[in-house]
Curated annotation (Swiss-Prot):
Keyword Ribonucleoprotein: yes
UniProt xrefs under Pfam families: Ribosomal_L25p, Ribosomal_TL5_C
Biological process annotations from GO: translation
Glycoprotein found in the keyword field: no
Assembly: Part of the 50S ribosomal subunit; part of the 5S rRNA/L5/L18/L25 subcomplex. Contacts the 5S rRNA. Binds to the 5S rRNA independently of L5 and L18.
Protein name (Swiss-Prot/TrEMBL): Large ribosomal subunit protein bL25
InterPro entries assigned to the protein according to its UniProt record, in alphabetical order: Rbsml_bL25/Gln-tRNA_synth_N, Ribosomal_bL25/Gln-tRNA_synth, Ribosomal_bL25_b-dom, Ribosomal_bL25_C, Ribosomal_bL25_long, Ribosomal_L25_dom, Ribosomal_uL5_bac-type
Keywords tagged on the record: Ribonucleoprotein, Ribosomal protein, RNA-binding, rRNA-binding
GO CC annotations on file: cytosolic large ribosomal subunit
Function: This is one of the proteins that binds to the 5S RNA in the ribosome where it forms part of the central protuberance.
GO molecular function terms listed in the Swiss-Prot or TrEMBL record: 5S rRNA binding; structural constituent of ribosome
Family label: Belongs to the bacterial ribosomal protein bL25 family. CTC subfamily.
Length: 197
């Protein structure tokens, strides 16, 4: 997984008014927490944060903080990100301080590979689970996990337990949960009729 330096500023004052002023100045209020530390309020540039979490790995990039004080050089990952519903810009972020030698639990996006045989035969793809939870060392966090669906027929599904865990990772999500299914026309019609009943 990639590592990126992120310049942040410590903030002593908190509250709605302070956060509003930070956002108006192009900054995002944030909190850093983790094992053995007291939560620390910081702010960071909106543009820098957006660039840091853009791309394939998304929120799972390892970020190294650059600031005054004890947090300088700390490695973090995004634990929670609140976005503006209209402009989709970050409004607040929780950062989890990590130790590169300790395993972390993260959600990783699933990437469907191929066109299912069932879709070619007239079925419909139902992509129910877009990400799964994995546990691994931070350096082994995958950008995404590929799921090959080319052989998937109408009426069949791929479950979490059928997904191969990338090297160095353990999949924590329910192995019985359906990730993707191919539905026939009758099944789709029944699903559409069910909410109306």
């Amino acid at each position: 997984m990639s590592k990126q330096v992120l310049k942040v500023e410590l903030r002593e004052k908190t509250g709605k008014g302070i956060c509003r002023r930070l956002r108006a100045a192009g900054r995002v209020p944030a909190v850093v927490y983790g094992k053995g530390i007291t939560p620390v309020s910081i702010s960071l540039g909106q543009k820098e944060l957006s660039e840091a979490i853009a791309g394939e790995g998304g929120r799972n990039h390892i970020l190294t903080l650059e600031c005054a004080g004890e947090l300088n050089g700390a490695n973090v990952i995004v634990a929670d990100l609140l976005r503006d519903s209209l402009r989709n810009q970050p409004r607040h972020v929780d950062l989890h301080k990590i130790n590169l030698a300790d395993k972390v639990k993260v959600h990783v996006k699933l990437n469907l590979v191929g066109t299912p045989a069932g879709v070619k035969a007239g079925g419909f793809l139902d992509f129910a689970m877009h990400e799964i939870e994995v546990e691994c060392l931070p350096v082994h966090i995958p950008a995404h996990i590929n799921v090959d669906v080319t052989e998937l027929l109408i009426g069949h599904s791929v479950h979490v337990g059928e997904i191969a865990a990338p090297i160095g990772t353990a999949i924590l999500s329910d192995p019985k949960a359906a990730v993707v299914s191919i539905l026939g026309r009758k099944a789709v019609a029944e699903e559409e009729a069910a909410p109306a009943a």
